[in-house]
């Protein structure tokens, strides 16, 4: 991966970064530190933010969820993509693919947003990203 490459950060990565007890925490932390050191252009989406906040609120505490939300604002250069109705409509095409069974609607919208922005890399621990043609970092 080149320096200053665009990278999409998925829910699983945010969760692993936020929760030190998460089995993927160390792997996520190492990937995150490498991305920051290489000046990666980081993106995520409103659906991913909402999904992550909800998970942290339910499986950790409200304070953890709020602290994570506040930490996003401190990340210089993080782009949070909105998800239009047109993008959601386009996302449904991924559900027709037989190789993407048990796909989440949030992941499908992520694929559309990544494709539209030309993002090839994802900090994600979900096999669907690779199946859909994106490259994992971390």
Labelled PLM ranges:
Residues 14, 49, 129-130:
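A generic structural signal for short hydrophobic patches within well-formed alpha-helices
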Residues 1-44, 57-71, 138:
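Short, well-structured N-terminal submotif of metal-dependent ribonuclease cores
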Residues 10, 51, 107, 126:
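Acidic active-site catalytic centers that drive phospho-/nucleotidyl reactions
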Residues 1-6, 111, 115-138:
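Acidic, PIN/NYN-like endoribonuclease modules and their adjacent C-terminal/linker elements
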Residues 38-39, 75, 132:
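Structured helix-beta-strand junction loops
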Residues 2, 79-121:
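Active-site neighborhoods of divalent-metal-dependent phosphate/nucleic-acid chemistry enzymes
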Residues 50-53, 92:
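Amphipathic alpha-helical segments within well-ordered protein domains
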């Amino acid at each position: 991966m080149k320096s200053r490459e665009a990278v999409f950060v998925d829910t699983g990565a945010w969760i692993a970064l936020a929760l030190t007890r998460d089995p993927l925490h160390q792997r996520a932390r190492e990937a995150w530190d490498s991305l920051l050191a290489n000046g990666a252009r980081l993106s995520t989406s409103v659906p991913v933010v909402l999904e992550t906040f909800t998970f942290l609120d339910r499986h950790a505490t409200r304070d953890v969820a709020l602290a994570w939300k506040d930490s996003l604002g401190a990340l210089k250069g993080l782009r949070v993509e909105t998800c239009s109705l047109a993008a959601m409509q386009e996302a449904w095409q991924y559900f027709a693919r037989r190789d993407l069974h048990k796909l989440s609607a949030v992941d499908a919208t992520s694929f559309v947003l990544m494709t539209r922005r030309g993002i090839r890399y994802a900090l994600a621990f979900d096999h669907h990203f690779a199946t859909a043609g994106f490259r994992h970092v971390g």
